[in-house]
């Protein structure tokens, strides 16, 4: 089916008090797995391609980006294709030109005034192309090696940021941390509720790989909508591949270990989509 507007997907999820799964793609196999999972449980899904993943693929957006768009268009469930954590404005433009229908401009590393000004410029050209924009206010832990209570978003500042920039979705710092390989993060659900009450757009949780299942359900109940997942899938995929290669040194065909790794990603994405839907 045609790409589905992420704003529509997020609004429907928020109205139903369920989470919207957004999963990062590092290899094409991940995208296949994510779409298959979404189709198996009849849930919408967001395929995310980050600036870091693009750098891994030689800095070329088009080859993998076009593949994601093709998978989305052939899917039998709603799919959006999203540029994740883009610090480069030109990369945001390139994604829009290629056909992505959502981008995340990450100016959280910039001085506050510059972040707001640049984010507003990205919103202007994206909205002209009917492309949604996500932004981040308050650095989520992990990007600078931190994971402490000081990494928090102020609700009123968040509301003002949305007013100043016009973004469609807002990623907030509420206790999660990027790139966690264990699931022990404790989210501030009271803060999530306060931000939800103050902000007129859907909220996004980055760093959800470090959050246990019960914490995710509580966060969604408190008002979190778009749930980003990356490291958690990498851990599962790599674990399967490692076990196969350690168990049989004669294996040389990548399909013999990449395939099972892909299937593990598929099964975990399906499980998470059901969890976020509170099934």
Language-model regions, residue ranges each:
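N-terminal basic/disordered segments at the start of proteins
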Residues: 2-4, 22-28
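Alpha/beta enzyme core
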Residues: 6-12, 16, 28-53, 61-76, ...
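Generic enzyme active-site microenvironment
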Residues: 22, 82, 134-136, 204, ...
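Hydrophobic alpha-helical scaffolding
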Residues: 24, 148, 227, 231, ...
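Glycine-rich beta-to-alpha transition loops that act as phosphate-gripper elements at the mouths
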Residues: 25, 81-87, 201-213
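Cofactor-binding active-site loop characterized by glycine-rich and histidine/acidic residues
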Residues: 58
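Extended, intrinsically disordered, low-complexity segments
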Residues: 244-279
């Amino acid at each position: 089916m045609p790409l589905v507007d992420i704003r529509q997907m997020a609004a429907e999820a928020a109205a139903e008090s369920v989470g919207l799964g957004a999963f990062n793609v590092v290899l094409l196999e991940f995208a296949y797995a994510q779409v298959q999972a979404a189709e198996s449980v009849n849930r919408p899904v967001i395929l995310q391609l980050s600036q870091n993943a693009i750098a891994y693929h030689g800095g070329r957006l088009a080859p993998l980006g076009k593949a994601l768009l093709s998978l989305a268009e052939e899917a039998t469930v709603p799919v959006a294709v999203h540029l994740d954590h883009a610090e480069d404005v030109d990369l945001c433009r390139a994604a829009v030109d290629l056909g992505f229908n959502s981008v995340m401009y990450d100016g959280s590393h910039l001085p506050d005034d510059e972040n707001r000004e640049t984010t507003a410029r990205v919103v202007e050209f994206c909205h002209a192309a009917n492309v949604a924009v996500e932004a981040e206010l308050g650095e989520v832990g992990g990007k600078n090696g931190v994971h402490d209570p000081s990494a928090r978003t102020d609700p009123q500042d968040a509301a003002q940021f949305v007013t100043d920039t016009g973004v469609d979705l807002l990623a907030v710092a509420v206790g999660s941390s990027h790139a966690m390989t264990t699931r022990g993060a404790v989210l501030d659900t009271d803060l999530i509720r306060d931000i939800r009450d103050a902000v007129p757009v859907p909220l996004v949780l980055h760093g959800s790989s470090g959050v246990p299942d019960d914490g995710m359900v509580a966060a969604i109940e408190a008002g979190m909508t778009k749930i980003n997942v990356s490291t958690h899938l990498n851990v599962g995929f790599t674990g399967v591949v490692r076990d196969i290669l350690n168990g049989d040194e004669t294996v040389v065909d990548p399909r013999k270990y990449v395939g099972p790794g892909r299937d593990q990603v598929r099964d975990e994405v399906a499980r998470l989509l059901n969890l976020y839907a509170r099934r």
